[in-house]
């Protein structure tokens, strides 16, 4: 087998694993708030399971980065898939005995699994040459298109298979998907992996974190992901409050997740052609349109339209921000910087997840939608400042 073929195979294995593992996140977001509303001791706690899921993502990010740095990506992948298996089985048990807090514990493991899955995008860049990094990153996230179909359809097909315990079979099936993902990942080869850095190698972390372009990249990642999560967490519960069927709600999440990942087939090329800043800005604008549609009404069409725009905006915003992060560090600094970036992103998401359920109950869907606009404006100002600063630097260099 030729080297190029092996590299392509590794990228597509990561993409297939993304499709299988992505079902974990899709199932959680499609069902977490609904299950929480049934099991929680009070309505304001309905979105706590999803908040705990995000806490799992945030708390696992730095340890996963350290595990990958010291023992290799495959060790991190194995840890993630083990967490996915545990999450599905514990969630099924929680539903069987109707335990809200045990379900929250399952979500903690599910979040840790999701944190590992998000490293697939950076892992793909170690399977290809430098000039193919953006395409590899996009190819892996494109596997989420399959997850966008697989996850919600899995929920719809299994949610009532054991009617006394809705969604129990769903989580058992999700644990099976984690096992299949582990098998697929066994064949991934990191042919362009940088040498392991010595302790203290690379620039001091403070130097990297002080870079204006890194600050803007992290801000855009935080806003894109947190605002998407804030709105998506509330959407299934808001649809239930509006009398929309769970089948239509699942389909809305399916459209959303497809919209999150389908643009990945071209996002890498768009970044190469127009630059990461422009693609990020386009994503922020699309998320803004999602908020406007959400404010505009609470019909099925409004929910679906807002979720599609929200997904596409996340893709451009988050992938553009990820590409900016890649430009802020050397190869041996990568795992540390990427782990810190993801830790900050997920940490911000925790806050959004915790407050979304209470805000939805107290203020309604329209207000929840409108609240995402100010952070989007702040991130857009940061992007425009970077664009103007870069243009000014070019002009000064030519003088």
Regions found by a protein language model. Name each.
Residues 155-156, 175-195, 382-387:
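C-terminal membrane-cytosol helix-exit motif in multi-pass small-molecule transporters
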Residues 19, 100-115, 302-316:
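Hydrophobic core of transmembrane alpha-helices in multi-pass small-molecule transporters
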Residues 1-8, 190-218, 399:
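Juxtamembrane intracellular "pre-TM" segments in multi-pass secondary transporters
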Residues 106-143:
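Cytoplasmic helix-loop-helix junction between adjacent transmembrane helices
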Residues 60-72, 159, 263-276, 360:
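Helix-to-loop junctions at the C-terminal end of transmembrane segments
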Residues 32, 114-128, 316-330:
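Intracellular juxtamembrane helix-capping segments at the cytosolic ends
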Residues 135-153, 344-352:
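Glycine-rich segments within core transmembrane alpha-helices of 12-TM secondary carriers
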Residues 82-97, 286-298:
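C-terminal ends and interior cores of transmembrane alpha-helices
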């Amino acid at each position: 087998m030729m080297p190029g073929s092996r590299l392509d195979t590794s990228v597509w294995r990561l993409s297939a694993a993304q499709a299988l593992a992505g079902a974990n996140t899709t199932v959680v977001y499609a069902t977490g708030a609904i299950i929480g509303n049934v099991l929680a001791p009070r309505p304001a706690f309905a979105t706590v399971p999803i908040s705990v899921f995000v806490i799992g993502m945030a708390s696992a990010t730095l340890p996963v980065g350290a595990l990958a740095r010291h023992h290799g990506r495959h060790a991190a992948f194995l840890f993630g898939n083990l967490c996915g298996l545990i999450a599905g089985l514990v969630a099924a048990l929680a539903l069987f005995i109707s335990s809200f807090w045990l379900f929250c514990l399952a979500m903690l493991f599910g979040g840790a699994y999701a944190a590992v899955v998000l490293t697939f995008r950076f892992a793909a860049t170690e399977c290809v040459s430098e000039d193919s990094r953006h395409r590899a990153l996009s190819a892996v996230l494109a596997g989420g298109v399959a997850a966008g179909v697989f996850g919600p359809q899995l929920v719809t097909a299994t949610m009532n298979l054991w009617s006394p315990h809705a969604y129990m079979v769903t989580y058992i099936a999700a644990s099976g998907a984690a096992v299949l993902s582990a098998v697929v990942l066994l064949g991934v080869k990191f042919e362009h992996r940088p040498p392991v850095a010595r302790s203290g190698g690379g620039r001091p972390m403070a130097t990297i974190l002080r870079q204006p372009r890194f600050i803007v990249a992290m801000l855009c990642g935080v806003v894109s992901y947190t605002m998407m999560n804030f709105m998506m967490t509330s959407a299934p519960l808001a649809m239930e409050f509006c009398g929309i069927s769970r089948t239509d709600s699942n389909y809305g999440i399916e459209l959303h997740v497809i919209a999150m990942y389908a643009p990945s087939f071209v996002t890498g090329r768009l970044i190469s052609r127009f630059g990461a800043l422009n693609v990020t800005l386009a994503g922020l604008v699309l998320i803004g349109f999602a908020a406007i549609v959400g404010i505009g009404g609470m019909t099925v069409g409004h929910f679906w339209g807002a979720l599609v725009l929200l997904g596409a905006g996340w893709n451009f915003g988050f992938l553009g921000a990820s590409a900016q992060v890649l430009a802020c560090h050397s190869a041996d600094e990568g795992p540390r910087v990427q782990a810190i970036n993801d830790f900050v992103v997920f940490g911000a998401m925790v806050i959004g997840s915790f407050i979304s359920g209470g805000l939805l109950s107290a203020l309604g869907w329209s207000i929840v939608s409108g609240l995402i606009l100010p952070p989007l404006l702040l991130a857009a100002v940061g992007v425009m400042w970077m664009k103007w600063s870069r243009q000014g630097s070019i002009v000064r260099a030519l003088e």
